C-alpha cells in the first residue's frame, strides 16, 4: 500500500523518513495505520500531521537503539587473579556469577512488587458499545450457564507428523471446490461455466483458485508482480498462472486466500483480473422461542459476564506465574459467570524452560511442572472456566494446529474446568463463540497485499479475512518461519479449522498485535492482548451480554441472536 501523496513537500518528508528509519513504504504505511489507531481516529494526511508522525517514529527508533546499547554494552574485561576479588578489596558487595539456577532466585523479588493486583488493575483501555446500559440486579439464584461444544473432540486427537501428501493435497483442493460451489450458487452460474484460469480466453470468464506467491526464495512475500492463482485439480489440473491485479480499483489478498475472479487470459500466460467476486458469508446463529425461554430462566433474565485472557502467564525471567496470580486474584475480587483462559501457560520459548534451568521443583516432566505450579493457582477459581491451549504450550503433547485439548484429569484440574481444543466453537446459552490461539492476525498482517481495501482499519480487515474465508487460519503456508510464534500447521487436518454451519457471534483471536475489540460485520471480534509482555503486566477482556429481548418475528419461530447489539466489550488493564 502506498501513501496517496501529491504534495511535493510532503513527499520529501516521506522520503527523508524512509531513509532515516531504513524501512520500505509498505512497512511505513502499517506504522501510519497503527499510529492513527492509537489516536482513535484517522487523521488527515497533511504536512503537519505527517511531521508529528515522523517525530514519533524517530523517537521510537532512538529508544530502540538506546535499549540495544544498554543490553549489549561494550565491556573491557580485566584478567582476574586467582583468589583475588577486586570488589571485596574495594569494600563493595560481592556479586556471584548468574547461572541458570540463580536466574530464577534473583528475579523473585522483582515479581513480588506486583502484589497480585495494582491500583491500576481493571482500568478500561478500550470499549465497544460504551453507550449500552446493561441493568444488573441481584438475582435470587446464581446463573446457570449451558455450555455446548460445537466440535468433535476425538477428531483433534490425531497423530502428528504422520501427514500423507495425498491427504494434504485433498484438503487443499477441497477448499477450492467448496468456494467454486459457493460461487455458482451465489451468482447463478453452472459448474461448467467456471473456467480454467491458465487457458487462453478473450471473453470475460469466472475462475476460482488459491492465491500463491511466486518466489524461488523461502519466505518470499506478495507483490503485484509475484501473484499466482492456483486452480483446482478438476478445473485446471492444479496449474498455477500469473494473476494481474493492476486493473482492480481495490483489493486485499494474501497467500492461501480462495478467491473468485472475473477476467480473461488473452495471452495464455497471465490472467487479467477485472473484478473479485465476493463470497456470501455464513448465516448467523438463531434459536427457537422455546430455547430462548430456557436460557432466560437459567440466567434469571440477567446479563452474562465473562473474562477472557491469553498467555504467556509468566514473566520473562521467572516461573512464579505472577500474571496468572494477578488474574485469578482479580476474578475472585470481581466475580463473573465464566472465565476463558488461553495459553501458553508453560511457554516453550521461556528462557528457563528452553534451557531446562528450572530450580526449586521436584517435577520430572513438564506436565508435572504444570500440576505443581499452575494447577494450584487455577484451582482457586470457583466459577466455570474454559482452558484453550496454544501450540507453544510445553505441557501439551500436541504441538500442531489444529491442536488437541489439555487433559484435565492428567493436569489435576478441578471439575469446574473444561478443556477445549484449538480452535473451537462452542455455545454459552444462546451465544456462539469461536476461539483460535494461533496468531492469524499477526501472520496475515505480514503477508497481506492490498490497495484501497473496503476495511480501512487494519484489525477489522484482518478479522474480515477470517470471516469471509470461513476458516480460523486461512493463511497458507502460514507463519511457519516465525521463530517464536510459528503456525505449526498440520495440513491434512486443516478441515478442523473451518467454521461450521454458522458465523460465530463472538470471535476471539489472541495475538501479539495490539489489543482491540470491534464490531466486524456484526461479529463481536476481539484480541484481549497478552497477560504479560516481558516484565510488565498486560491486558484482558470483559464481555457483558444482555439477555435477548424478543420482538415480533412474524411467522418464524427462530430468532437471530443479535449479539453485537447487546454486548458491551471492554479491554481492561491487568
Swiss-Prot record:
GO molecular function (one): DNA binding
PTM annotation: Phosphorylated in a cell cycle-dependent manner.
Transmembrane as UniProt keyword: no
One CC-aspect GO term: alpha DNA polymerase:primase complex
InterPro entries referenced in this protein's UniProt entry, alphabetically: DNA_pol_a/d/e_bsu, DNA_pol_alpha_bsu, DPOA2_OB
Protein origin, superkingdom: Eukaryota
One Pfam family hit: DNA_pol_E_B
A GO BP annotation: mitotic DNA replication initiation
Compartments, record wording: Nucleus; Chromosome
Keyword Phosphoprotein: yes
Keywords for this protein: Chromosome, DNA replication, Nucleus, Phosphoprotein
Family, as annotated: Belongs to the DNA polymerase alpha subunit B family.
Summary of subunit composition and partner proteins: Component of the alpha DNA polymerase complex (also known as the alpha DNA polymerase-primase complex) consisting of four subunits: the catalytic subunit pol1, the accessory subunit spb70/pol12, and the primase complex subunits spp1/pri1 and spp2/pri2 respectively. Interacts with orc1. Interacts with orc2; the interaction occurs on the chromatin, is stable thoughout the cell cycle and is independent from spb70 role in the alpha DNA polymerase complex.
The protein's role, per its UniProt record: Accessory subunit of the DNA polymerase alpha complex (also known as the alpha DNA polymerase-primase complex) which plays an essential role in the initiation of DNA synthesis. During the S phase of the cell cycle, the DNA polymerase alpha complex (composed of a catalytic subunit pol1, an accessory subunit spb70/pol12 and two primase subunits, the catalytic subunit spp1/pri1 and the regulatory subunit spp2/pri2) is recruited to DNA at the replicative forks.
Protein name: DNA polymerase alpha subunit B
Organism: Schizosaccharomyces pombe (strain 972 / ATCC 24843)
Protein's gene: spb70
Amino acid at each position: 500500500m502506498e501513501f496517496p501523496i501529491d504534495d511535493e513537500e510532503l513527499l520529501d518528508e516521506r522520503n527523508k523518513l524512509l531513509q532515516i528509519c531504513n524501512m520500505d513504504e509498505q512497512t511505513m504505511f502499517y506504522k501510519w495505520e497503527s499510529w492513527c489507531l492509537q489516536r482513535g481516529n484517522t487523521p488527515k494526511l497533511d504536512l503537519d500531521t505527517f511531521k508529528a508522525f515522523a517525530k514519533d517514529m524517530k523517537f521510537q527508533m532512538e529508544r530502540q537503539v538506546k535499549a540495544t546499547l544498554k543490553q549489549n554494552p561494550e565491556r573491557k574485561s580485566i584478567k582476574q587473579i586467582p583468589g583475588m576479588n577486586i570488589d571485596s578489596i574495594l569494600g563493595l558487595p560481592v556479586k556471584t556469577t548468574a547461572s541458570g539456577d540463580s536466574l530464577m532466585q534473583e528475579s523473585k523479588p522483582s515479581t513480588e512488587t506486583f502484589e497480585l493486583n495494582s491500583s491500576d488493575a481493571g482500568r478500561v483501555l478500550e470499549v465497544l458499545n460504551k453507550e449500552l446500559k446493561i441493568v444488573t440486579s441481584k438475582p435470587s439464584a446464581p446463573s446457570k450457564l449451558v455450555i455446548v461444544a460445537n466440535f468433535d473432540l476425538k477428531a483433534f486427537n490425531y497423530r502428528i507428523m504422520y501427514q500423507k501428501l495425498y491427504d494434504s493435497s485433498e484438503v487443499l483442493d477441497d477448499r477450492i471446490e467448496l468456494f467454486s460451489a459457493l460461487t455458482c450458487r451465489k451468482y447463478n452460474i453452472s459448474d461448467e461455466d467456471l473456467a480454467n484460469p491458465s487457458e487462453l480466453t478473450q471473453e470475460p470468464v469466472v475462475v476460482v483458485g488459491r492465491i500463491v506467491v511466486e518466489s524461488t526464495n523461502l519466505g518470499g512475500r506478495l507483490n503485484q508482480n509475484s501473484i499466482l492463482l492456483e486452480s483446482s485439480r478438476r478445473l485446471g489440473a492444479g496449474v498455477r498462472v500469473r494473476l494481474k491485479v493492476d486493473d482492480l480499483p481495490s483489493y486485499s489478498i494474501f497467500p492461501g486466500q480462495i478467491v473468485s475472479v472475473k477476467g480473461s487470459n488473452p495471452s495464455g500466460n497471465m490472467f487479467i483480473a477485472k473484478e473479485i467476486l465476493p463470497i456470501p458469508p455464513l448465516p448467523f446463529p438463531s434459536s427457537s422461542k422455546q430455547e430462548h425461554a430456557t436460557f432466560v430462566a437459567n440466567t434469571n433474565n440477567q446479563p452474562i459476564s465473562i473474562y477472557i485472557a491469553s498467555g504467556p502467564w509468566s514473566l520473562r525471567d521467572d516461573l512464579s506465574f505472577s500474571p496468572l496470580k494477578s488474574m485469578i486474584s482479580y476474578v475472585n475480587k470481581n466475580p463473573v459467570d465464566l472465565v476463558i483462559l488461553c495459553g501458553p501457560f508453560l511457554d516453550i520459548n521461556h528462557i528457563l524452560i528452553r534451557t531446562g534451568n528450572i530450580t526449586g521443583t521436584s517435577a520430572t516432566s513438564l506436565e508435572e511442572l504444570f500440576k505443581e505450579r499452575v494447577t494450584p493457582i487455577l484451582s482457586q477459581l470457583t466459577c466455570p472456566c474454559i482452558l484453550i491451549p496454544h501450540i507453544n504450550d510445553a505441557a501439551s503433547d500436541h504441538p500442531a494446529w489444529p491442536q488437541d485439548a489439555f487433559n484435565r484429569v492428567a493436569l489435576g484440574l478441578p471439575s469446574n474446568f473444561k478443556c477445549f481444543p484449538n480452535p473451537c466453537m462452542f455455545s454459552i446459552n444462546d451465544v456462539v463463540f469461536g476461539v483460535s490461539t494461533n496468531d492469524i492476525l499477526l501472520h496475515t498482517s505480514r503477508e497481506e497485499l492490498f490497495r484501497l481495501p473496503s476495511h480501512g482499519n487494519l484489525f477489522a480487515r484482518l478479522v474480515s479475512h477470517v470471516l469471509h474465508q470461513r476458516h480460523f487460519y486461512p493463511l497458507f503456508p502460514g507463519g511457519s518461519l516465525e521463530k517464536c510464534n510459528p503456525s505449526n500447521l498440520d495440513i491434512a487436518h486443516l478441515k478442523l479449522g473451518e467454521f461450521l454451519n454458522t458465523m460465530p457471534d463472538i470471535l476471539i483471536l489472541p495475538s501479539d498485535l495490539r489489543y482491540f475489540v470491534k464490531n466486524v460485520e456484526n461479529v463481536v471480534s476481539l484480541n484481549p492482548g497478552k497477560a504479560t509482555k516481558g516484565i510488565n503486566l498486560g491486558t484482558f477482556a470483559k464481555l457483558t451480554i444482555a439477555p435477548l429481548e424478543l420482538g415480533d418475528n412474524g411467522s418464524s419461530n427462530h430468532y437471530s441472536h443479535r449479539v453485537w447489539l447487546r454486548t458491551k466489550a471492554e479491554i481492561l488493564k491487568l
